[in-house]
Regions:
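Flexible coil segments in periplasmic/lumen-exposed cytochrome c-class electron-transfer proteins
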Residues: 3-47, 60, 65-72, 76-143
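Short cysteine/histidine-rich zinc-coordinating motifs and their immediately flanking basic loops
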Residues: 48-54
Length: 143
């Protein structure tokens, strides 16, 4: 599991991650500065030595899912400080802070080159630019 996380953390970040609705980014920024910046950093860079993940450039839906899993205890390896920190967030606050977070950009050297395809997914899966290639034809049905 640790080897898998180390591998995934070294993959380049997509240049076109999924964003939220953009409805309340000012609130999201304020909440991020008040609640997240001390651990995750001003640019969402995380802290490798403290095992705090980089969250810049993550997909909004992924962030929403992980936030909820951390809050409800489904993610059992969560930092107890974070679990406590996020308990009081309303759904609107959660959406705002994670929409803001999804818009934080990783450094250029962490971004995937244009046209990069994740080697772990077949060619027909959505690539880094969000383009869906044609999937292979299904096998012929025998009668």
């Amino acid at each position: 599991c640790i080897r898998d996380r180390a591998y995934v953390s070294q993959l380049p970040k997509t240049r076109h991650n999924g964003l939220g609705p953009g409805a309340d980014l000012e609130l999201g920024e304020r909440l991020y500065e008040e609640n997240c910046v001390d651990c995750h950093g001003a640019a969402g860079e995380g802290d490798v030595e403290k095992h705090i993940p980089a969250i810049a450039g993550q997909h909004y839906e992924y962030l929403m899912r992980q936030f909820e899993n951390i809050r409800t205890g489904k993610r059992r390896n969560s930092d107890p400080e974070m679990v406590e920190q996020i308990q009081g967030f309303s759904p609107a606050q959660q959406a705002a802070v994670l929409d803001y977070t999804a818009r934080l950009r990783p450094p250029e050297d962490k971004l995937a080159p244009y046209g990069w395809l994740n080697p772990d997914f077949p060619a027909y899966v959505r690539d880094a630019a969000g383009i869906r290639a044609t999937p292979p034809a299904p096998p012929a049905q025998s009668e």
